[in-house]
Amino acid sequence: MLKDVLFALWFFLPAGIANVTPILVAPLPGLRRLDAPIDFGLTFRSRRVLGAHKTWRGLVSGVAMATLTLWLQQLAVGQYAWARTLTGSVDYAHLPTVLLGVLFGLGALGGDAIESFFKRQRDVPPGHGWFPFDQLDYIIGASLVTIPFVALSLRQYALLIVLWLVVHLIASYAGWLLHLKERPL
């Protein structure tokens, strides 16, 4: 069971990193020029499509960090025995790292954007939680777009969802304690 838990954490790390990156890079002044909303301010039914919090800065940085994370994982698997024990049945040596890293990032942030669309349509203010959708959006998005390259068993997906849900809750609370987020959930 421990091996399965470690695999789920290792395998999905690029998506988890993509999901948290926009929050971490928000205060960086060098990326402010990318601080434009990806919905271009458009509305649907008199409500913003995604809102001002979904920016090009977050999308670009999240996708870049997911790709970098997967590349570092691939290097680690090639160099270190401890990393090879985390890979399960996934052959990291033959993964299309750049493509899959981009998909992890786009899937995670795309899932988050889709969930934001529904939050806006339900009048949930930006920054306010919408449990459990806020915690599952990136997991579902990244899982769906990576299936053509790495298909896991239903048990592995279930474990992945539960573990990363818990990781997300802990990270959100930590972000709130560190004043990176306005609300704990």
Task: List PLM regions with ranges.
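Transmembrane helix-loop junctions at the membrane interface of multipass transporters and ion channels
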Residues: 146-150
